[in-house]
Amino acid sequence: MQIVMFDRQSIFIHGMKISLQQRIPGVSIQGASQADELWQKLESYPEALVMLDGDQDGEFCYWLLQKTVVQFPEVKVLITATDCNKRWLQEVIHFNVLAIVPRDSTVETFALAVNSAAMGMMFLPGDWRTTPEKDIKDLKSLSARQREILTMLAAGESNKEIGRALNISTGTVKAHLESLYRRLEVKNRTQAAMMLNISS
């Protein structure tokens, strides 16, 4: 597993490198402090997990994530932040952000978040966002099959895996997902999975 840490504190990168390498076999961690440096590393590892320092300026982080996801659509993102309730964090979730972890979390929590994000699963703090009534109503309006598919999607299953488990074609899975996205007013798998996670 390749991780690129974009962080203003080299000591945080160093500490995380030592700690995660002790807990995740075969993990390789590189640090970057400039946007060009990050993109250069992602040229070599376009499917890497990016750990972004969320304590930097919100507008800068938004810009960086937007640019990064356009250039490297396969990249997965984990954000570390002292305050996980910053408004901009909710606005960037659709930029392949799969995990948001408080910077003072234990190493075990970071390892769990990294492994979850690497598998395409969401990892968000329990109190990360208050659940709007609308989200719950939208989820209740889904059919039983759509809820089933959404649950599997949130667990990181691919369309092919969902189709195999439910004995339906991948085309049918895709059609269900498109209908589900419209119903929930979301644009992608990550946003749909997040709605399920925050309402449960």
Curated annotation (Swiss-Prot):
Keywords: DNA-binding, Transcription, Transcription regulation. GO terms for molecular function: DNA binding. Signal peptide: none annotated. GO terms for biological process: regulation of DNA-templated transcription. PROSITE patterns: HTH_LUXR_1 (PS00622), HTH_LUXR_2 (PS50043). Residues 159-178 bind DNA. InterPro entries: RcsB_transcriptional_reg, Sig_transdc_resp-reg_C-effctor, Tscrpt_reg_LuxR_C. Residues 135-200 form the HTH luxR-type domain. Disulfide bonds: none annotated. The keyword Signal does not apply. PANTHER family: HTH-TYPE TRANSCRIPTIONAL REGULATOR YHJB-RELATED. This is Putative HTH-type transcriptional regulator YhjB. It comes from Escherichia coli (strain K12).
